[in-house]
């Protein structure tokens, strides 16, 4: 009871007093000649989610300013696409957010298909959604595991990568690759599912649904250290999240029920029953709850895909040489980190005139500059876990 009362008091104080009140009073600073400290964190740092550099200004252990510096993994992806044929761009998208390869391929193919006006076979649409939801699980669970690992807990990351490994085995059986799939193609998918895979996936999600509570929820939510390190950290309001253009779990953890799958439906999502998971706290703990509940929703979607998937072809009427008419195509999907959108401009040739990617990791990184100040230095890792950026996404 005392612990709950203490927590309630701390939350009340946090609501009344902004985090910046931890800073040393300016009068005291002038009297004693105190100075802030500039410190670099990264780009080579095991907890930076990739090649990211944070320039920090510290007042003791309190963050005064945080400037993210990106570009260490920039590969000119959009420019390279201008010199590739339309199908040859698909392998490049796998190298963007490498924890959401299927979603990247799907978003790009939707944009080109928008230009072509091609009809996708129903079976291919269900296979696309099936693969993307497996990919979402294979991203969310490691994200949770990484968050706990950065807080000092080792066991959840082992359970998370056990599940990711099993899903990658399915990907390998279907696509021939474990990460860079090149599976979703313009007009459909590369190949049909092997005959034994649907039953194996069904058995897997049945077992996963039973394992989530003991292996993740019970292990994490009863951990006092996790609660102390995540509750109230980087608390976002709905207005702040919308103003920053956040999408995905960082937005939905504030209570904004925006999901591209429902609000701008694509593929066969309108035919599937699922809930848009939200929370109201807007902090790191809330983002964890959103991700773990979305795993349950992905399991629900996977079951429906396996039940409703019709027989038939898996590729539409698209020639080997793709040459869309002049114009612009747009595709958007709901990736694990938020809205992934692709804008393709065609000049009538077999190579794109312009390709632009809107990756959620890049947009959501704005949160660091806005919400880091006022928090303590050790809070950087939980806040990074809220954003869950991937360097292949923010650097294209």
From Swiss-Prot:
Identify the domain of life: Bacteria
Which Enzyme Commission number(s) are listed?
7.1.1.-
Q: Which interval of the chain is the signal sequence?
A: none
Q: Name one GO molecular function term.
A: NADH:ubiquinone reductase (non-electrogenic) activity
The UniProt catalytic activity note for this protein reads: a quinone + NADH + 5 H(+)(in) = a quinol + NAD(+) + 4 H(+)(out)
Q: Does the keyword Translocase apply?
A: yes
Membrane topology is: Peripheral membrane protein
Under SUPFAM superfamilies, the record lists: HydB/Nqo4-like (SSF56762)
User: What is the protein's major site of localization?
Assistant: membrane
Query: Where in or outside the cell?
Result: Cell membrane
Q: Which GO terms describe its cellular component?
A: plasma membrane
Keyword ATP-binding tagged: no
What job does this protein perform? Answer: NDH-1 shuttles electrons from NADH, via FMN and iron-sulfur (Fe-S) centers, to quinones in the respiratory chain. The immediate electron acceptor for the enzyme in this species is believed to be a menaquinone. Couples the redox reaction to proton translocation (for every two electrons transferred, four hydrogen ions are translocated across the cytoplasmic membrane), and thus conserves the redox energy in a proton gradient.
Q: Give the record's family classification.
A: Belongs to the complex I 49 kDa subunit family.
* Full protein name: NADH-quinone oxidoreductase subunit D
Organism of origin = Rubrobacter xylanophilus (strain DSM 9941 / JCM 11954 / NBRC 16129 / PRD-1)
| Organism classification | Bacteria, Bacillati, Actinomycetota, Rubrobacteria, Rubrobacterales
């Amino acid at each position: 009871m005392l612990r709950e009362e203490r927590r309630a008091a701390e939350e009340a104080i946090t609501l009344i007093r902004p985090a910046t009140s931890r800073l040393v009073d300016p009068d005291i600073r002038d009297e004693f000649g105190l100075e802030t400290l500039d410190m670099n964190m990264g780009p080579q740092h095991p907890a930076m989610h990739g090649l990211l550099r944070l320039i920090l200004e510290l007042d003791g252990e309190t963050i005064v300013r945080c400037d993210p510096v990106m570009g260490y993994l920039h590969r000119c992806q959009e420019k390279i696409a201008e010199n590739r044929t339309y199908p040859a761009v698909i392998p490049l998208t796998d190298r963007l957010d490498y924890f959401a390869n299927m979603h990247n391929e799907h978003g790009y193919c939707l944009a080109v298909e928008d230009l072509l006006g091609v009809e996708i076979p129903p079976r291919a649409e269900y296979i696309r959604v099936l693969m993307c939801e497996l990919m979402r699980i294979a991203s969310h669970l490691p994200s949770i595991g990484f968050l706990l690992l950065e807080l000092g807990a080792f066991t959840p990351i082992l359970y998370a990568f056990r599940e990711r490994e099993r899903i990658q085995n399915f990907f390998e059986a279907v696509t021939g690759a474990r990460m860079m799939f090149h599976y979703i193609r313009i007009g459909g998918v590369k190949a049909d599912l092997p005959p034994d895979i649907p039953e194996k996936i069904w058995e897997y999600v049945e077992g996963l649904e039973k394992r989530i509570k003991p292996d993740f929820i019970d292990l994490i939510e009863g951990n006092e250290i996790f609660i102390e390190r995540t509750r109230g950290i980087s608390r976002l309001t709905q207005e702040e999240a919308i103003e920053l253009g956040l999408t995905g779990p960082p937005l939905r953890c504030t209570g904004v029920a925006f999901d591209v799958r429902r609000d701008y439906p694509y593929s066969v999502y309108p035919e599937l029953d699922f809930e848009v998971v939200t929370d109201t706290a807007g902090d790191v703990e809330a983002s964890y709850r959103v991700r773990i509940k979305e795993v349950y929703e992905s399991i629900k979607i996977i079951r429906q895909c396996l039940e409703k998937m019709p027989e038939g072809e898996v590729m539409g009427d698209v020639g080997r040489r793709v040459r869309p008419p002049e114009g612009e195509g747009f595709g958007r999907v709901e990736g694990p980190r938020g809205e992934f959108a692709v804008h393709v401009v065609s000049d009538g040739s077999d190579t794109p005139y312009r390709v632009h990617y809107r990756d959620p990791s890049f947009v959501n990184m704005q949160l660091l500059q806005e919400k880091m100040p006022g928090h303590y230095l050790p809070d950087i890792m939980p806040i990074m876990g809220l954003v869950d950026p991937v360097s292949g996404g923010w650097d294209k």
